[in-house]
């Protein structure tokens, strides 16, 4: 949904129309409301889903073998807690439920974590997105798969679970993955989220 991807609201609407026709769930993701994705664009996407009667699917639904469609799975990544909190009234207006894939969770303040906990009251969920938001295939090449799991993946899962979140899905930073990493992480969560991009799309780190 970020503007850098170059997709218009009309293109998101067309994707939702295809989801209705094919009885599929379409996945949209972004980062910082009001920064990387304009709030009015995000609201237009949410409103379009509501107008089409598309259920809002969470990634925990996928982990449980549900949410196959038609539906729309919306997610925001990283740790822009205050920006996410700002859009909660808009999301409530449409009864929209999002998955927030959180990176650097262990570095958040107690106040930020308390704000995230409040998101559950609106039907949203938190899922892990790694500790340091690194390109995981490169990490494995440099340090090995065990180091990736022990230093980046499992601590992000365990930190959320320690605070009461089930942590049933994992989103790859930059969407970068390999089948070897998939196999290892799937021992600990039920579903993975990677990404696909149009040819030539620049994948940049939207984290602070």
Q: Model regions: which residues?
A:
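Metal-dependent polysaccharide deacetylase catalytic core of the NodB/CE4 family, i.e.
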Residues: 1, 24-35, 69-72, 82, ...
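N-terminal pre-catalytic segment of deacetylase/amide-hydrolase enzymes
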Residues: 1-74, 116
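A generic secondary-structure signal
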Residues: 14-18, 48, 90, 155, ...
